[in-house]
Amino acid sequence: MKFKIGDTLLDNNVFLAPMAGVTDLPFRLLCREQGAGMSVTEMVSAKAILYKNKNTKELLAVDPAEGPVSVQLFGSDPEIMAAIAAQIQDGPYAAIDVNMGCPVPKIVNNHEGSALMKDPAQAEKVLTAMVKAVKKPITVKFRKGFNDQSINAVEFAKMAESCGVAAVAVHGRTREQYYSGKADWDIIRQVKEAVKIPVIGNGDVFTPEDAKRMLEETGCDGIMVGRGAKGNPWIFKRITHYLETGELLPGPTLMEVRDMILRHGKMLTEYKGEMTAMREMRSHMAWYTKGMRNSATLRCEINQVETLEGLAELLEKRMEAE
């Protein structure tokens, strides 16, 4: 199903969620190749951009081959958020997303991320300022609420809509849940029924069947896949194919997994240098090989790998053993 944000018409309505330490440029490219309709960058601190932090350049980088990309900012100062949105709006981004759902303590303790769900008035100031400052669409991602005593996703979505936000993405857990328990898809349904702007559902989409159920049970306009895409960029092709045809494509073969890991490693090496790439591939390898025989041994061995050549040799040895 097509999806439109601002003037950008997406190929489909299946999104790659922003994930710190995961959705860098190489991984977004792989997910786009596998059919993601749109991806979102790792979250970027507006203050860090303001103060010209050296790491922000890498976080803000995109490639034309990625297709539509949204850049995700976090912060709680309306003036800074608006100024940075204006500063980057001429960049190659289809939209500017605002993180109001991150549950990490260092973000929350700084009154950012999901902390803003406890302060809707401040969140409203941030969104209003950003919408006024730019022509590009502003979207916002948030949670069910801060905790079970303050479930306010519906009110929060209405507030965002009144500010002129183009779309909202809702994760069906509270901040206190982090990623434990089960995502509450009914809150996504409630948000969808309460606003006229597009609603993107997020939380516990790990299979094509999950994606279809979310659409059917919530009526949401789009699906955002986060943890389900870790080590599994194929999920986008499998979801879109299933939604379009009802046919369930098989998962990747061992050789396809091996080839994807190698491509990922090569792309990371070109982008970040071999030492950093091999260090980051340790996490990705754990995700790619989850469920395989001897995966624990493989994860242990990858920690010793320091070169792309070493990665290729390890994969050859271990995949043959499988």
Language model region names:
Residues 1-2, 10, 14, 20, ...:
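Alpha/beta catalytic cores of nucleotide-metabolism and tRNA/nucleoside-modifying enzymes
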Residues 2-4, 19-94:
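Glycine-rich, positively charged N-terminal anion/phosphate-binding segment
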Residues 3-15, 49-68, 102, 106-110, ...:
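N-terminal small/glycine-rich loop or linker at the start of catalytic domains
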Residues 14-18, 39-41, 69-73, 96, ...:
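Hydrophobic faces of well-ordered beta-strands that scaffold small-molecule active sites
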Residues 19, 44-46, 74-76, 101-103, ...:
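Active-site beta-loop-alpha junctions enriched in small/polar residues
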Residues 82-96, 100-112, 121-197:
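Alpha/beta enzyme core
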